Each structure stands twice: as structure tokens, then as C-alpha cells.
């Protein structure tokens, strides 16, 4: 939409959150509230996004990308004052859409409808409204027929006006030229000395300007988040939206009540999510994979047909048709090629595991390069850290490591080689070689352990 801009108000302190973090930086479904609003605006192709910042400006600004323009509100003197700071930046902008950074449940289709009505009626202003069964504490929309009259705040409403269920959400479209003039006519008539943006509607009405409304069917879009309890309630709404979306896209979710998927996750059809699965960050799961139960993956990639059970993964790549778990721990830098098996109580860190290799149980593999068709026996440990530096272990294709092998890095095991159970290997092993390193077994005859009396 050319000649449009979005202005997102995010200057408030959020005192009720009782946090050192600015309110709009608290996360919902894995993303800051403000980012949800920015993403929504960009999905409807509004070319410019301005964020009005005040409290916590440095913290918020550090998270914004180059596409986002920052407008500074040095003193928080109300919503009208915030827009006054943004208007001088609206060069070659005919219309703006004003949103709140603490309303992350706004949807793209709602913004499209709001903009459409604004344009169709050549309105000076268009308000997004919602109908609440219990609108206590919210500003009411007064109309005569379908004609907007004004917004009445709860404290100023008559008993009859308080029965009105249609409320003001705080999201608006404005004609910039008309808004610029209207802002000159509002004054701070309250004890706080604040300029209220809603006062411009009275100015427009007095001038005979067109003011329209659009009532969203989803009341959750109107929810502003001002407390931890409200954040938790919004999290539940966002989670249900995400789960419903992926089920519509062909993902099987066995128990939605115990499944958590963040907004940045991507799933393909025929993925199955077992109970108590948590998918976070930029995790991607390919078709026919089965995740869970009791699995948490953060910024991981899972290939087609893989099974991941009772596992924690962070920044790991899992190839196709792998079997992971139960009780595996995949740390950052782990790359598993196709058909790899990682069994119970195995930890892998910063290592590449070749196709068809197996690490069945009770092992630690760190800073290692493992070839194809390698078998790593139970209890094998790569000793990669000397207290100062980390060192690399290389295990070539088709090597077989006996149980309880210790590999003291830097060390290389040649292709097709075997290590004897219980060996501590500190020197390179050539290809097709058996390496055994053991202490001599001793028998002490006629020895009887002293017993406690």
C-alpha cells in the first residue's frame, strides 16, 4: 500500500509488569510483543513502520532491524503527544495506521479490512472496535445509527452508556493531512497533563469529517497486555491459534493441551507431535517426522521420517530417518547425517556424525568428526578439554569403538579400526587396526574383605 505508514506506540513503562524489561519486550509465543505487531504490519505490505519509544528506548532499539524507524517521545505525555512526535516524520505519507505495541494479537486480515473501509469511505479516521460481554473499564463507542459520534471513557460514561458493549481498541487509520490539523486543536484537559489521541474524533466530528468504524469478530485483538496475568492469558490465545493453524496444515498433534509451538517454527504435513512437545525459535521439522513425547527443540532442523523422543536439542541439525533418544542431549553445532542413531543418555556437542553411524547409549561426543557407519560403544567418551583448550577427535568410516573407550583428543581413529573395551586411546590409530590399552589384570588369592562387626 503506497503512501501508507504504521505508527506503533511503545513508549510506556509498563509499571504493572514489575520488570526491568520494557513492557513491549516481554515475549509471546517466542517473540517480543512489539515484534508481533511489526510482523503483522509488514504482512499487509505497509511500506514504512515507525515505533514511538520512550522508556527503555535503548533496550528496544537494539532489537529492531533497519526497516524500522524510531521516533523518540522524551516525555510520556499521552497518546496524542506520541502521535505529535511521529507526524513530522510522515513525509509523502497520505495515511497512517496507529497501533499499540502491547496488543500483539492483532491479525493481518483485520488490518486489511480496517484499511479497506478507511479507503472506501475516504474517511478522516477509522476506528477498530470490538464487542465485549463485559466491557468494564474500556472506552465505549457511541453511535447514532451506524454513524460514529464519540468515544466515552468508563469514568465519564452515564449508566446507559456503560451498557454499550462496543469498545475502542486503540487501533486507528487516519488521513495524515487532516490529523495534522486536528492535533493542533487538542489540549491536555486532565490532571495528568496528557494529550489524548481520542480527542481528535471530537474535532473531526465538529468539522463534519467522515469517521468510520470496523468491528472485529475476535475480541482477543483488543486485549492490551499490562500485567503478567494478562501476558499469560494472551500466550494461551496465541498458542491455540498456532496449534489450530498447523493442524489445518496437516500436522497431527496428539494432545494440543500439552504441546507448545512458538511463532517462528515451520512444520511440514504429516509431522506427528506427541504429548509434551515444545518447539521453539526457528525449529523446522520435515514431513513424516515424529517428535516427542517429552521433547524440547530450540532452533533445530529435523529431517523427513526422523523420530525424536525424550530429547533436548539446541541449534542442532538432524538428518532424515534418524532415531534420537530417549534422553539424548543435542547441543549447539551438532549435525547428524541421515539414518543416524543416538540412544539413551548420549550428549553430543559441536560434532558431525556421518550417515548410518550409531551412538546407542551412555556416551559423550564433543568437538568431533565421526564418519559413516561408525559404531560407538556404550560409555565411550571423547576427552576434548584439558582445562584450557578444546581439541578435536576424528573417527573415520566404519570404525568400531568398544564399550568404555576414552578418546584423549586430539586423536584420530582410522577407517575400519577397532578399539578394545575399556581402552584409553591417546595416540592416532591407523586404518584397519585393533587398538587396545589396558592395565594388567591381577588376582590376589585367598583375599577376604574385612567385614564390619
Curated annotation (Swiss-Prot):
Its cofactor is Mg(2+). InterPro entries: Bifunctional_GlmU, GlmU-like, GlmU_C_LbH, Hexapep, MobA-like_NTP_Trfase, Nucleotide-diphossugar_trans, Trimer_LpxA-like_sf. Residues 229-249 are annotated as: Linker. It catalyses: alpha-D-glucosamine 1-phosphate + acetyl-CoA = N-acetyl-alpha-D-glucosamine 1-phosphate + CoA + H(+); N-acetyl-alpha-D-glucosamine 1-phosphate + UTP + H(+) = UDP-N-acetyl-alpha-D-glucosamine + diphosphate. CDD domains: GT2_GlmU_N_bac, LbH_GlmU_C. Residues 1-228 are annotated as: Pyrophosphorylase. Its EC number is 2.7.7.23, 2.3.1.157. The keyword Phosphoprotein does not apply. This is Bifunctional protein GlmU. It comes from Desulfitobacterium hafniense (strain DSM 10664 / DCB-2). The lineage of its organism: Bacteria, Bacillati, Bacillota, Clostridia, Eubacteriales. The gene is glmU.
Amino acid at each position: 500500500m503506497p503512501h501508507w505508514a504504521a505508527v506503533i506506540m511503545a513508549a510506556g513503562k509498563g509499571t504493572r509488569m514489575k520488570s526491568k524489561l520494557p513492557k513491549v519486550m516481554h515475549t509471546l509465543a517466542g517473540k517480543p510483543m512489539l515484534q508481533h505487531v511489526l510482523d503483522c504490519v509488514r504482512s499487509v505490505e505497509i511500506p514504512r513502520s515507525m515505533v514511538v519509544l520512550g522508556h527503555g528506548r535503548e533496550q528496544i532499539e537494539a532489537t529492531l532491524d533497519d526497516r524500522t524507524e524510531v521516533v523518540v517521545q522524551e516525555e510520556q505525555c499521552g497518546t496524542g503527544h506520541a502521535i505529535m512526535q511521529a507526524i513530522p516524520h510522515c513525509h509523502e505519507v497520505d495515511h497512517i495506521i496507529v497501533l499499540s505495541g502491547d496488543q500483539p494479537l492483532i491479525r493481518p486480515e483485520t488490518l486489511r479490512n480496517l484499511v479497506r473501509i478507511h479507503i472506501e469511505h475516504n474517511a478522516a479516521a477509522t476506528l477498530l472496535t470490538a464487542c465485549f460481554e463485559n466491557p468494564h473499564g474500556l472506552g465505549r463507542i457511541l453511535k447514532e445509527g451506524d454513524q460514529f459520534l464519540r468515544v466515552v471513557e468508563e469514568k465519564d460514561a452515564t449508566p446507559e452508556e456503560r451498557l454499550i458493549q462496543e469498545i475502542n481498541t486503540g487501533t486507528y487509520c487516519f488521513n495524515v493531512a487532516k490529523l495534522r490539523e486536528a492535533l493542533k486543536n487538542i489540549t491536555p484537559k486532565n490532571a495528568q497533563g496528557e494529550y489524548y489521541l481520542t480527542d481528535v474524533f471530537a474535532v473531526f466530528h465538529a468539522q463534519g469529517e467522515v469517521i468510520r468504524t470496523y468491528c472485529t469478530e475476535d475480541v482477543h485483538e483488543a486485549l492490551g497486555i499490562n500485567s503478567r496475568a494478562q501476558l499469560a492469558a494472551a500466550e494461551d490465545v496465541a498458542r491455540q491459534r498456532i496449534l489450530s493453524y498447523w493442524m489445518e496444515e496437516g500436522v497431527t498433534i496428539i494432545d494440543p493441551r500439552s504441546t507448545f509451538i512458538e511463532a517462528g517454527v515451520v512444520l511440514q504435513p504429516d509431522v506427528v507431535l506427541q504429548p509434551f512437545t515444545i518447539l521453539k525459535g526457528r525449529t523446522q521439522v520435515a514431513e513424516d517426522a515424529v517428535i516427542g513425547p517429552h521433547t524440547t527443540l530450540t532452533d533445530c532442523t529435523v529431517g523427513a521420517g526422523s523420530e525424536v523422543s525424550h530429547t533436548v536439542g539446541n541449534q542442532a541439525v538432524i538428518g532424515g530417518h534418524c532415531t534420537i533418544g530417549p534422553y539424548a542431549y543435542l547441543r549447539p553445532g551438532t549435525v547428524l547425517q541421515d539414518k543416524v542413531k543416538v540412544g539413551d543418555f548420549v550428549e553430543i556437542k559441536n560434532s558431525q556424525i556421518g550417515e548410518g553411524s550409531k551412538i546407542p547409549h551412555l556416551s559423550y561426543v564433543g568437538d568431533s568428526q565421526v564418519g559413516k557407519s561408525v559404531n560407538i560403544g556404550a560409555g565411550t567418551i571423547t576427552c576434548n578439554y584439558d582445562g584450557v583448550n578444546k581439541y578435536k577427535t576424528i573417527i573415520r568410516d566404519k570404525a568400531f569403538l568398544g564399550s568404555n573407550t576414552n578418546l584423549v583428543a586430539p586423536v584420530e581413529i582410522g577407517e575400519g579400526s577397532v578399539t578394545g573395551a575399556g581402552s584409553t586411546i591417546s595416540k592416532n590409530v591407523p586404518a584397519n587396526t585393533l587398538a587396545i590399552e589396558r592395565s594388567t589384570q591381577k588376582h590376589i588369592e585367598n583375599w577376604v574383605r574385612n567385614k564390619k562387626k
